[in-house]
Amino acid sequence: MSKVYDWFEERLEIQAIADDITSKYVPPHVNIFYCLGGITLTCFLVQVATGFAMTFYYRPTVTEAFASVQYIMTEANFGWLIRSVHRWSASMMVLMMILHVFRVYLTGGFKKPRELTWVTGVVLGVLTASFGVTGYSLPWDQIGYWAVKIVTGVPDAIPVIGSPLVELLRGSASVGQSTLTRFYSLHTFVLPLLTAVFMLMHFLMIRKQGISGPL
């Protein structure tokens, strides 16, 4: 094993990278509340893992979506556990994100020179809320259907561009298969990709600028 490690070490300088990661200075005022962002990241990773597992059984059609969710909960091996963990970690992610925002605001972590870190955090907050809206519709039960109908109908109040926005969100003039397909695509591909990109930006900025000092 040592020869294999030495081969990689010679080419990638793994030890130098590890030393750089583990030797970052942590200010003495940092406490448990500074871990809220990391907990949010952990919840996101749990979401990715459990969501990926459910894609093996979920069918994004208006005729089969609800039945496929029932199959996951009642027949698929550990399906009930995977979906339950997915739901619990989703709620935990939202809660931890809200607490993280309050902590950053109350400790002044949004001030110069960390404005861009704050902006990426706000974008991540919007993406997290979007996860909730799109994921809520996927079982395609009564609650999910009417939630989608109400949410996608909100832009209709905007003058001129309201109706085109509604049709863009729904994929047609009314809520149906096109809507479910779009929400499934957003929930399983677009939003996770954007979240991963903005999380990477967020953490790189924190890594570069360090943790903000005490008030």
UniProtKB/Swiss-Prot annotation:
Binding-site list for heme b 1: 100, 202
- Indicate yes or no for the key word Plastid: yes
Complex and partners: The 4 large subunits of the cytochrome b6-f complex are cytochrome b6, subunit IV (17 kDa polypeptide, PetD), cytochrome f and the Rieske protein, while the 4 small subunits are PetG, PetL, PetM and PetN. The complex functions as a dimer.
Q: What does this protein do?
A: Component of the cytochrome b6-f complex, which mediates electron transfer between photosystem II (PSII) and photosystem I (PSI), cyclic electron flow around PSI, and state transitions.
Keywords of this entry: Chloroplast, Electron transport, Heme, Iron, Membrane, Metal-binding, Photosynthesis, Plastid, Thylakoid, Transmembrane, Transmembrane helix, Transport
Q: Which domain of life is it from?
A: Eukaryota
The record, for Gene3D superfamilies, names: Cytochrome Bc1 Complex, Chain C
One annotated GO molecular function? metal ion binding
Gene assigned in the entry: petB
- PANTHER family assigned: CYTOCHROME B
Enumerate the CDD domains for this protein: Cytochrome_b_N (cd00284)
Record field: transmembrane = 32-52, 90-110, 116-136, 186-206
Q: Which Pfam families match?
A: Cytochrome_B (PF00033)
Location of this chain's protein in the cell: Plastid, Chloroplast thylakoid membrane
**Chief place where the protein resides:** plastid
Membrane topology field: Multi-pass membrane protein
Q: Name one GO cellular component term.
A: chloroplast
Q: What does this protein's record comment on cofactor binding?
A: Binds 2 heme b groups non-covalently with two histidine residues as axial ligands. Binds one heme group covalently by a single cysteine link with no axial amino acid ligand. This heme was named heme ci.
| Protein name per its UniProtKB record | Cytochrome b6
Keyword Lipid biosynthesis set for record:
no
